[in-house]
């Protein structure tokens, strides 16, 4: 096994789709259930803006909320017990022109912060999961791009 970072974990991928399409995918709570290994088969929970899914690891039901920031191309994921969701995961999309990429591509970075008290084994599993999840996101976004190339995506402004 590799050494696991103690405080945070970050993974980045090149996505062959526009930043807007990638952001739209990440901001859709129902799509989280297609790539987040701890929240598969996502569905709305019993409170507005809160969703639940099942962990592929142990079948436990997990809750999450999605807070998109369109102007920043940033999506914040709050996770934890339904009544105590905490923002611990972020997905940041970087536009092609910011880093000299081809126009129809972008970078995606997933970042997770380790809470104090999270056991090393669980943190290691989370880090390994993110290394897989970024591939799931990449493939699903790129497959959507192939099905609907040049789809114009207009982002809504950040909620006030």
Describe each region flagged by the PLM.
Residues 1-47, 160:
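Hydrophobic ligand-binding cavity/cleft-lining segments
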Residues 12-16, 65, 92:
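Generic structural detector for well-ordered beta-strands
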Residues 33-34, 41-88, 101-103, 144:
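Glycine-rich portal/gate segments that line the openings of hydrophobic small-molecule binding cavities
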Residues 81-143, 148-155:
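Beta-strand/loop substructures that line and gate deep hydrophobic ligand-binding cavities in soluble
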